[in-house]
Amino acid sequence: MKVNNQWIRGIWSDDGGKTVCFPDQTKLPYQLEICREGTSDALIRAIKTMQVRGAPLIGAAGAWAAAFLCREAKTEEALQKGLKRIAEARPTAVNLQWAVRRVASAAEGLSGDVRAARAQKAAEEICESDIESNRAIGGYFASVIEETYRKNGRPVRILTHCNAGWLATVDYGTALSGLYVAQEQGIPMEVWVDETRPRMQGLLTEWELREAGIPCTLIADNAGGYLMQQGEVDLVIVGADRIASNGDVANKVGTYLKALAANDCGVPFYVAAPVSTVDFSLAEGVESIPVEERSRSEVTEISGIGPDGNVTRVQVAGQDTAVRNIAFDITPARLITGCL
């Protein structure tokens, strides 16, 4: 997508595939800083620290990590150990495991430069496929937005949780791709953006939409239910980190509560995700999808702009405060209007 008149993707290759570049999402929306990495270890670290985040983008970064590993590994044992480390960097987003398997399969039985070239091609194909999938998802959801607009005759009011835009993918996004396509079609919209504690990914969504010229309003996480009760939400659209075979959806913690409120208020609730997010090995998700728990500091500290204009972190809870930082929750399929 365009930022400051410059076209930027969630991740892209450079130097003939020797390195990849990506915006450091731990610095956004305060600073746009582009990272350049060329080793599997560096990309594993970027995935773990959420410099890259969002299930499809984690998958793409994992694909490049696997491709770099195919170039680096001197033995089959080192290759297999490295692939396992990449796949386990984040446990909930199934796209990561899927992408690693696909690159490993493309390079299986090969060695040296041939293996490296085949792995790089697989990583490139995964990235291009992600863009195509997201554009298709955008077309589907744009038709839902258009239908709602024609029915109501006013700007469509959409609520979204976390960030499922181009920052969470290679480009366009999943949940937000429909908004971008609808904007191209001239359909008026107003977007409610959940702040999405504790990592405040809603700030990324607000930044994305503002850069794209789509009207949006940042709200506290717990405000969505009230807005639905008051008839101020026409549609809810979210992304997904893993979808079980029965349609249960793992997504950023808080998604389940939005789905419950939408169900109670009769507001359509949609999930947007590529096929790589579906885990066909799981019959259901509520009891089976592994849910990541992250550092207590994500809850007890928060980033912002200090009086000197620089990004700073402040503590909002004491060191003796008991904390449990659950990163995802599972929304049962019965609460979901449709998966796009």
Residue ranges of model-derived segments:
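Ligand-binding beta-strand-loop-alpha-helix segment within the catalytic cores
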Residues: 95-157, 189, 193-236
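Histidine-anchored nucleotide/phosphate-binding helix
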Residues: 172-184, 259
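Short beta-strand segments
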Residues: 23, 61, 65, 97, ...
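Helix-rich catalytic cores of soluble enzyme domains
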Residues: 149, 154-176
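Conserved phosphate/anionic-ligand binding catalytic regions in large, soluble enzymes, centered on
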Residues: 49-62, 96, 163-171, 324-340
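Short, hydrophobic/aliphatic alpha-helical segments
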Residues: 35-51, 156-160, 309-325
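Conserved phosphate- and dinucleotide-binding cores of soluble alpha/beta proteins
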Residues: 188-189, 194-340
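Long amphipathic alpha-helical segments
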Residues: 2, 9-113
